[in-house]
Regions:
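Non-transmembrane domains of secretory- and envelope-associated proteins
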Residues: 49-50, 158, 169-176, 184-236
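N-terminal secretory signal peptides that target proteins for export/translocation
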Residues: 1-24
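A short, surface-exposed beta-strand/turn
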Residues: 93-94, 108-110, 178-191
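Flexible, surface-exposed loop/linker segments and immediately adjacent secondary-structure boundaries
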Residues: 129-160
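N-terminal leader/targeting segments and the immediate start of mature chains
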Residues: 36-38, 42-83, 94-97, 225-236
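Short beta-strand segments that buttress and anchor functional surface loops
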Residues: 72-74, 99-103, 163-171, 191-195
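An acidic-aromatic
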Residues: 85-137, 197, 202
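Gram-negative bacterial Sec-dependent N-terminal signal peptides
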Residues: 2, 24-43
Length: 236
């Protein structure tokens, strides 16, 4: 099941007044998968050897720790190659914090315990539990440091671009393989393909990447008071 499908399954349950608890794990996994897709690229830097790879990795980590904003376009296709969903959005990153915006969703994590999103379409404000397990998966620094969790192989190197395949060493991952393409000399990727266990493929193209040194942790705090007309759904 693709990221967008999981989100919309949860939204449909809310809209139809169904019990949303069974859908919670799907949505949480989807959000973590999306952040992983956006950030997995720098892990491929260790497919190279020597001080150059170390320097690039440290530069990528510092870039995210200091603040960065990424614009992306994504498309999800099924096993038959049919497009299920396409969208554009923005993700802002500052150390452990992120703010992800796409379609009618505004998803926030403050790096500590506040994990929430606002659904503009249904006018819902949803709160999740930012426990240690979720923090570990969503923390960009920890993700950048987890290169040993993937088996990496170089697929191609041409026209100033390197393409790598990353497969998880641990079983049970929602993604069977990442295919990551990035320009030489750049820490963050330009294209990421995530192939799910079910065979769905989500292709993310990074259309813009800029430093965002003025980001503050307060920018990632989302409260119900910002949406006075919204229904608050507390799943903590």
């Amino acid at each position: 099941m693709s990221f967008v499908q999981k989100v919309y399954k949860f939204r449909q349950a809310v809209t139809e007044g169904k019990n949303v608890i069974p859908c919670l794990s799907f949505l949480q996994g989807a959000l973590l998968l999306w952040i992983g897709i956006c950030l997995c690229g720098p892990q491929t830097l260790f497919a190279q050897k020597g001080n150059q790879a170390d320097a690039l990795f440290l530069a990528a980590s510092q870039r995210i720790k200091s603040g960065v904003m990424i614009d992306f376009a994504s498309e999800t296709v099924n096993t038959k190659g049919q497009t299920l969903h396409s969208t554009k959005g923005t993700v802002k990153l500052l150390d452990r914090c992120f703010r992800l915006r796409f379609d009618d969703l505004d998803v926030n994590y403050d790096g500590n315990s506040s994990y929430s999103y606002y659904d503009r379409k249904n006018d819902n404000f949803v709160l999740f539990d930012g426990n240690k397990e979720h923090v570990a998966d969503m923390n960009p620094i920890l993700v950048l440091s987890s290169w040993k969790q993937y088996k990496r192989s170089l697929l191609s190197s041409a026209n100033g671009k390197n393409k790598y395949s990353l497969t998880p060493l641990a079983s049970g991952s929602a993604v069977s393989r990442f295919i990551v393409t990035f320009d030489r000399g750049r820490a963050l990727p330009t294209r990421i393909e995530a192939v799910s266990r079910e065979g769905y493929t989500t292709v993310v193209s990074v259309t813009r990447e800029v430093s965002a040194p003025k980001l503050k942790r307060g920018d990632f705090v989302q409260t119900a008071s910002e949406y006075p007309s919204a229904e608050v759904i507390d799943l903590r």
